[in-house]
């Protein structure tokens, strides 16, 4: 199941784990990324907590945790090469995996149609 937030994060949810990254729209707004800081594995976040930071040639921006949960994995490839986020934001450019405290909370996020409407 693919979900989106109004803060331009995407979530690919499989069971009680969500892979999280930033959307194509966010990447377009930021420009070329030059730095990514990810959370620690095992860290817990509340919804909308500041989980990661990205810096681009234009600005620095926070990446928010879309739902309550615990970080189970991070993507070290994007720390070594932030351009992966630019080239494949919803694939190889994922940020972290989040074990959801309450998977049903994902129902309150945007579906693809609603997100496209938000960014139109």
Curated annotation (Swiss-Prot):
Modification N6-lipoyllysine occurs at: 58
One GO cellular component term noted in the UniProt record for this chain: cytoplasm
Gene Ontology biological-process entries: glycine decarboxylation via glycine cleavage system
Cofactor dependence: (R)-lipoate
Record-linked Pfam families: GCV_H (PF01597)
Coiled coil: none
Recorded superkingdom: Bacteria
Cofactor-binding details, from the entry: Binds 1 lipoyl cofactor covalently.
All residue ranges annotated as the Lipoyl-binding domain in the record: 17-99
UniProt-listed HAMAP family: GcvH (MF_00272)
Function comment: The glycine cleavage system catalyzes the degradation of glycine. The H protein shuttles the methylamine group of glycine from the P protein to the T protein.
Subunit: The glycine cleavage system is composed of four proteins: P, T, L and H.
Protein's UniProt name: Glycine cleavage system H protein
Gene: gcvH
